[in-house]
Amino acid sequence: MEKQIKVIICADDGEWSRENTDALASRGAQVVTVNRNGTALLTKIRDEKPDVVVMDLFMAGVDALGVMHVVKAEGLPKPVFIITAAYSSNALERQIMEAGADYYAIQPFSKTEIIDRIFTLAGAAQHLSNGTSRSDLRIQVT
């Protein structure tokens, strides 16, 4: 049996509804919520050691790029980072992904798809933590 995944959702009230939190929990996730503030989010990441963090690119205190930088600089276990934003550009997307994001979602997006993506990415991360390195993974395109 796979371990329960821990997900931190960093969003203002109303952005991530109770229904979506319940949907995650019904699929076996432990959900922790924090208001959209990067400084508060960093405290939760340090305390909770989540498997997945869903956060907006722009937050009070510290933005998503800053959060990912601090996690790396402090040597904290790296969660799967899912970044949400209201707009996109190729340069911005490249910067976010290079900073350590695992997925970048442009709003509006389907919460069902994000929930599915959380479990897909968390499963891949668990597989990697069980001894398979990224260099062991191969993609074959036919």
Where are these regions (language model features)?
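CheY-like receiver
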Residues: 124-142
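Acidic, metal-coordinating helix/loop segments flanking the phosphotransfer/catalytic sites
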Residues: 34-52
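Acidic catalytic/metal-coordinating carboxylates
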Residues: 37, 63-66
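Active-site residues of response regulator receiver
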Residues: 55-57, 85
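Short amphipathic alpha-helix used as the core "switch/output" element in two-component signaling
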Residues: 65-76
